[in-house]
């Protein structure tokens, strides 16, 4: 089961849990798809797009559970990133953990991300 990751403000994730699905953050809605990262990409995503931001969560999602709505597409830099064209069903989410800032200002990822 390959996992992909979504970094999200905790308050927005709580709204998704109440609604039963995640429709996306403002940037996702503007772009027309939900942005995800692979395990190899998620730290750079956090540093580039969430630097210094606290009160985030990291959702691990079963990529296979998303079917054909999930596409791997090139970013501006050429790397292939997972994009979901449609809402994220919470049934595909395998875990949600806090993504706190460490003392050095970078996000502290769970050890299981490297497992």
Q: For each predicted feature, which ranges?
A:
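Conserved, structured core segments of small domains
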Residues: 1-115
């Amino acid at each position: 089961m390959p996992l992909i990751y979504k970094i999200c403000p905790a308050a927005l994730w709580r709204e998704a849990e109440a609604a039963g699905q995640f429709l996306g953050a403002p940037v996702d809605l503007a772009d027309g798809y939900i942005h995800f990262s692979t395990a190899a990409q998620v730290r750079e995503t956090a540093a580039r797009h969430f630097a210094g931001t606290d009160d985030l969560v990291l959702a691990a999602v079963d990529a296979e559970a998303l079917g054909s709505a999930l596409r791997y597409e090139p970013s501006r830099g050429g790397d292939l990133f997972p994009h979901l064209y449609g809402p994220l069903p919470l049934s595909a989410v395998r875990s949600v953990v806090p993504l706190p800032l460490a003392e050095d200002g970078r996000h502290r990822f769970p050890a299981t991300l490297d497992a």
